[in-house]
């Protein structure tokens, strides 16, 4: 398992132990993330969730879900009110975008302030379920605050995020880390060329799985001037000191699995010579910012939002 596969497997193992995920769903996600039944079962054993699953149970769990009338959340062809595929678009308001990336067409959702002008650009990286309406809503919130925001879709190489969130998670977990880092670099370059985006660099934020790729982007992309990862793992702590970004790292105190890294992150960020801060919210757990989930913590989310906006305004 690579670092992100282990991160995902540990998260879903916790959900299974807390009875918020069924054994069937756990099995399916493990197989999709690891790419095969044997690898999925081995990963479950490695995170303490091995079991004597019957061949019938495994076969049932790994069957794709029946098609439903629910619409896919993947990007659609731009409409008259959507932002066009070209970065030179002058269309105000939100819309789906697509452009040629390093390995496939890259998809996303762009939101901009209604009033024409020059604004700081922000990339938003979704959780492990893929690009969804919650993440698009965050992009619109940034636009209302005076930013041009692009919510990326890191499932793009697999055709884009779908309504089947387990499949989205599987695509993210089985992807090569270097491919997703390359895609994030391409999103950063694209956003810098969007009409109205302030020259000289962008900001990036993300949540959960996306929080990890905020750290990746802060290390790999010189265009990133400011970064705000929410409860994300830092895979390359030993390289964090090379980042040129101003980093505000946000954690929940109850999220022990991720927050255990916070002191190491703080120490490495102090070596960058750039503004940095680590903020841990008492009483908040993993995914506390997501107002559609069970872990939502309204006071912590509101304060984190205020601090995030201030960070980007000061550093982008």
What residue ranges belong to the model's regions?
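Serine-hydrolase catalytic machinery in alpha/beta-hydrolase-like enzymes
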Residues: 15, 22-32, 58-70, 88, ...
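Short beta-strand/loop motif that positions the catalytic acidic residue
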Residues: 249-251
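C-terminal catalytic histidine-bearing segment of alpha/beta-hydrolase fold enzymes
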Residues: 275-316
